[in-house]
Regions:
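Divalent-cation
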Residues: 4-166
């Protein structure tokens, strides 16, 4: 869910803006998977990113607009970004298709632009909180015409409204 979906700033032309389309779990022992889709009107690319259960919870909470009683780690990082006057320009998902995704944050403070490599799950959770675009390297995307569980997962989908705090 990238808030500024048309904006990516200065970026490699091989990157496309993505939206988080959901989080799924493919079995009792499986790790959660965050599903991303191309943000364009007719974009067909999709990408799944395996994350840990805590990171999946952080992403789901933000997607559903739920604020936990106390800030989680990603909420704290987002607050620190804002208080320090930093802007997250975008989160980039990249890497070689056979090695799995990697991620980096492209951020700035004043005129200084910086890049920091991070875990994909952290990049997604922070980008969602700071309403920054999530961009992915086209080479990582699967397409409708290629067989892939990324596009039609046999999963339990965690739907909006399924999370609550006591």
């Amino acid at each position: 869910m990238s808030a500024r979906s048309g904006y990516v700033g200065i970026m490699d032309k091989n990157f496309v803006v993505m939206s988080v389309s959901g989080v799924s779990i493919e079995g009792d022992d499986a790790l959660p998977v965050v599903m991303l889709r191309e943000d364009r009107d007719h974009g067909e690319g999709a990408l799944s990113v395996t994350v840990g259960p805590f990171e999946a919870s952080a992403i789901l909470l933000e997607l559903e607009g739920i604020s936990p009683p106390r800030p989680l780690t990603h909420d704290l990082l987002a607050d620190l970004f804002r208080e320090a006057g930093m802007e997250l320009e975008r989160a980039e998902i990249f890497g070689l298709p056979d090695e799995g995704p990697r991620a980096r944050l492209v951020y700035r403070r004043g005129l200084s632009r910086r890049i920091k490599e991070v875990r994909p799950s952290d990049a997604l959770a922070l980008a969602l909180r700071l309403k920054a675009p999530i961009c992915a390297d086209r080479d990582l995307l699967s397409r409708k015409d290629s067989p892939s569980v990324l596009l039609r997962p046999q999963t339990v989908h965690l739907a909006p409204g399924s999370l609550e705090f006591p």
